Curated annotation (Swiss-Prot):
SMART domains per the UniProt record, alphabetical: CRF
Functional note: This hormone from hypothalamus regulates the release of corticotropin from pituitary gland.
InterPro entries for this protein: Corticotropin-releasing_fac_CS, CRF, Urocortin_CRF
Listed name of the protein: Corticoliberin-2
Pfam name, any one: CRF
Propeptide segment residues: 25-119
Annotated Gene Ontology cellular component terms: extracellular region
Signal peptide: 1-24
C-alpha cells in the first residue's frame, strides 16, 4: 500500500512539476550580479509577497519569523495598510474581541469606554448613522447568538445529564 502510494506520488510529481513560483530560489554563485539595485529590490519584493501571503492566511502561525518593518519601508507601508484593512474587516464582522491588543503602527487604536458610552448616548449625526446602525445590528446579532448558544447548551445538559 505504501509502495503504491509512493510510486503514484512520484509519477504525479514527474508528470506535473510544480510551477516556477513554487520552486526554491536558485542561489548559485555561478550567475554574475548585473545590477546592485536589482539585488536590493528582490528581498523587498520577496518580503512584500511573504507579508501579503501571511495577511491572506490571517497570520495563523504567530511564531513565524517576520522581517523588521524598518528594513523595507515600501513593503512595510503596504503591509500596514493591509493589516489596517484586515483589522477593520474583523471588527465589522465582530471577530476581534480586544482591539487594544493590535496596538501599534499596524492597527487602529481602541476607543475608551467613556467615549463609547458618550457616543451611544448622543444621537448619531448623518455621517455616523451608518456605523451606528451597523453597530446596533452587530450587537443584536451577538445577543441572538448568545441566546441560541445558551439554548443549545441547556439541551445538551438535559440530554447528557447534569
Amino acid at each position: 500500500m505504501r509502495l503504491n502510494f509512493l510510486v503514484t506520488t512520484m509519477a504525479l510529481l514527474v508528470a506535473f512539476p510544480p510551477p516556477y513560483e513554487c520552486r526554491a530560489i536558485d542561489s548559485s554563485s555561478n550567475q554574475p550580479v548585473t545590477d546592485p539595485d536589482e539585488e536590493r529590490q528582490s528581498p523587498a519584493v520577496l518580503a512584500r509577497m511573504g507579508e501579503e501571503y501571511f495577511i491572506r492566511l490571517g497570520n495563523r502561525n504567530k511564531n513565524s519569523p517576520r522581517s523588521p518593518p524598518d528594513t523595507y519601508p515600501e513593503a512595510s507601508q503596504y503591509s500596514k495598510r493591509a493589516l489596517q484593512l484586515q483589522l477593520t474587516q474583523r471588527v465589522l464582522e465582530g471577530k476581534v474581541g480586544n482591539v487594544g491588543r493590535w496596538d501599534g503602527n499596524y492597527a487602529l487604536r481602541a476607543l475608551d469606554s467613556e467615549e463609547r458610552e458618550r457616543r451611544s448616548e448622543e444621537p448619531p449625526i448623518s455621517l455616523d448613522l451608518t456605523f451606528h446602525l451597523l453597530r446596533e445590528v452587530l450587537e443584536m446579532a451577538r445577543a441572538e447568538q448568545l441566546v441560541q448558544q445558551a439554548h443549545s447548551n441547556r439541551k445538551m445538559m438535559e440530554i447528557f445529564g447534569k
